[in-house]
Amino acid sequence: MVDTKCYMPTYCLYFTQRRCEYIYIYNSPNFFSDFIRKNKKNKRPNIYQLIFQRLLIILYLCALVIRWRYGLFFSGRLVRERNMFSKELKEECGVFGVWGVPRAAEVTYYGLHSLQHRGQEGCGIVSVNDKGELQRVKGLGLVTEVFNTENLGSLHGDMAVGHVRYSTHGGGGIENVQPFLFRHNSGDFALVHNGNVVNSAQLRKYLEDRGSLFQSTSDSEILAHLIKKEPVERNSPRIIPIMEALNMIEGAFAFMVMTNHRIYAMRDKYGLRPLSIGRIGDGYVLSSETCAFSVVGAEFVRDVEPGEVVTIDHHGIRSRKYSDYQRHAMCAMEYIYFSRPDSDIEGRNVHSFRKESGKILYRESHVDADIVVGVPDSSLSAASGYAEASGLPNEMGLIKNRYIGRTFIQPSQEMRDKGVKMKLSPVRSIVKDKRIILVDDSIVRGTTSLRIVRMLREAGAKEVHMRIASPMIKNPCFYGVDMSTHKELLCYSRNLEQARQAIEADSLAFLSEEGLFEAGHRSDLCLACFNGNYPTALYSSIEEVNEEHKF
């Protein structure tokens, strides 16, 4: 039976006939062949059956028209529209793993809570019970929506991996929610992934030509098929096929692979996505961010290094490098926007980074004003730094409604236009007749910035000076951030003055790249979205960008 809770968001159509039952999801390309095959039993269809068949065809064609009209083919847009009130920029996901800790699934549940900001479309947990069997619970929605006492209690054992997802590649849908679970003659294993594989199209074709059958459109599944294609004796370590598979993958990733005995954790050779190791008693935890460690009572041990494969089992922690080439190129947006302020990334606290960037931003582009206002939530640290450096009061001029932003309703244009007002509200008594320094972490498409500036003016602000605690985003990201084309970026085809006019601010300034390095106390960051210097080859990703400019 189809899980209606999981599939209703993708608009299932249910039809029942007297002699056969149809459960048809209009994503299926085999609908007509299945329908005809099932009706061959009806030698002499009556008038009601003929009418019913024609109604089905009409409904099917209507569904196709709707998908074409709203651009839904292969885009996963229906799922993304649930986040229509959220901030412009989205990161793909967060991963969490537990080894050797009693009630590991429960620990993973709390860990995923702490990583919820990294993905809100779906989540899942796989655990290993006392018999060595892998058990899974996953679904669409927040951690609190997917898990309850009953299904969480069904996940036994002292090993588990979990995942929270936001789709930037492969679209939405329950089939793309991780962890992925794979059956293999050498033993079952589960896989979770944060990042993006830039040569996924080539690898998928390579694997399909050799007989691989994919159960999702997510590029995360590619690693599993690369591992499976190598012969491995049952219950033997998978480290060799894993390392061989990783050398075929290009891009940004933090993977975890869990068998019935051990967990393998690995980062790409550039270190674009974070992954840290913590300890609870005699057991270990792994997380995309260190903020989850304090919640589960873990002590930070170290970060997984770029190009490293860590094996955790009853022998403890063992380490191997899958590539002779390693370099640190942590995604700058992890510090600027994605990570929680209480997380530490490779030795640098996120809040401290953002606050320091705010101070440097004032030094580089100060202007006369009355108050400083940060855009909730990720810009508040930078706003406090700007206010401290300038001596201006740091006011809460914008209030965030935390209960807006998740809906399964396809919104109208009017609802979209009201989206920012529903999520952010100005405090009129604070902003009225004031010259405001409005601090935000970044500008991607500019639509949110424009609406906030207009909102503050409507609330009585005399002037609104926009200050951005990062450089101008001019290039797409192919490493797991939801900005994949040039044309959607405000600053790609505009200079500073044109960007200012587009968002209707009185002035606009961005943090320099040098200021970003100074705030992070490091220069080994990936700034590809700012300066176009991509640390990896781009393969099919750059082909998509070139295709965009053909017209």
Question: Where are the predicted features?
Answer:
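Conserved short alpha-helical segments that host acidic/polar catalytic motifs at enzyme active sites
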Residues: 76-306, 311-369, 375, 463
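Phosphate/diphosphate-binding loops
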Residues: 429, 434-448, 454, 492-505
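Polybasic, lysine-rich low-complexity intrinsically disordered segments
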Residues: 5, 38-42
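Compositionally biased low-complexity segments enriched in histidine and/or tyrosine
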Residues: 3-10, 14, 19-29, 62
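Short, glycine/charge-rich flexible loops or terminal/linker lids adjacent to PRPP-binding catalytic cores
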Residues: 391-437, 447, 474-481
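PRPP-dependent phosphoribosyltransferase catalytic core
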Residues: 246, 261-262, 279, 297-303, ...
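Extended, hydrophobic alpha-helical segments in both membrane/secreted and soluble proteins
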Residues: 372, 379-386, 394, 435-456
